[in-house]
Amino acid sequence: MNSNPFSDTTIRKIERFQWWHQRRTKLIFIILIILTILIISLSLILKFVILKPSKSKITTTTTTTTTTTTTTTTSYQQYVWRDTGNLVNARYRHAASVLNDGRVLITGGLGSTYQLRTAELYDPSAGNWTLTGNMNIEREFHTSSTLTNGKVLVVGGEASRGYQNTAELYDPSTGVWTVTDSLEYARSEHAATVLLDGKILITGGYNGRDYLDSAELFDISTETWRNTTSMNSGREHHTASLLQDGRVLVVGGSDSRTAELYDPLTEAWKYTGNMTIGRQSHTATVLANGKVLVVGGSHDPTSRAELYDPTTETWTVINGPKDIRFDHTASVLTNGQVLIAGGYAVDDLITTELYDPSTGNWIITGNMSHTRTDHIAATLLNGNVLVAGGYDRGAKNTAELYEPL
């Protein structure tokens, strides 16, 4: 007699249930293992690929000749460029100054067909541009300097009525421009340097006939100009950099490879070694260690860069950026690196590169959204770099931000 209380059919159902239950348990266990592997894999991808754009791919190239061996190391990094608000007026050959409150003042430049006297303010907190008061005279190839009292001094340039010796002061608190004392000499494509005592040194430039060697000083307490000692060479499209000891280094211009030092205490100029090539429309950037990095130029277009050491007053050729360029911009980042952006070579450039003074290497970083030359670049108080305007088959009104990681 069968003592099992379940029928054969019921027993088979129970056995099938147990078999499916065991199989389902195994399947669930396998699926959980697969999901765990996928989650770990995705985490690694996010960590090392997507969220680590600053990791560099480094390429080292060694070139040997009978006399020299040059090693060039290039890294590749992706940083963040993003569009910000457009300028109200498209422009190039304009000027920019960072105000004490963090806003950026853009002045003048060349529009689609003529010089501009309009001025605009960029607000980093809102990411937009607004018109402010117009200058009294339209200008391109002028200079713009933020003074120690917070006002902005705009000097010289080229206008429809000719080369300018005029100057204007902008008051950010009122948005009003005021004509101030005029320079003795009209000039454009000159350089302006804010000295340690607050005075403004104007050097060189072009007046339609000659490359100028003259220099003038603006006293903000009296708002007047006076002549200072002239440079040893006439120059335009040169650079003038304030060194840490208060002297001013003037480099290149007018296809020159010469450099001069100005001492504000004695108001004397002296030559200080020659670069290896002539440069104009280049950039010169004072590094945290006090040296000056010179990049690019249009006389002998080259990727070769040079470093000036103020302590020894000597020049050294160093590794250069990948791209030959001039009419570009150079901006010092908060980490001490130098951002080179845009410019012109065979065509207008979209590329950007970083120079790392700690290693002497160049880093190819992400491209801008727009090609541009004759633009401006301003380092904001938050460390970002604003690039605005410029030329690319016409005046541009676009602006973008570089955000270091």
What do the predicted segments below correspond to?
Residues 3, 8-17, 42, 46-47, ...:
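Intrinsically disordered, low-complexity regions
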Residues 46, 71-405:
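Kelch-like beta-propeller repeat domains
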Residues 28-59:
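Alpha-helical transmembrane segments in eukaryotic/viral proteins
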Residues 1-25, 57-67:
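Intrinsically disordered cytoplasmic terminal tails of membrane proteins
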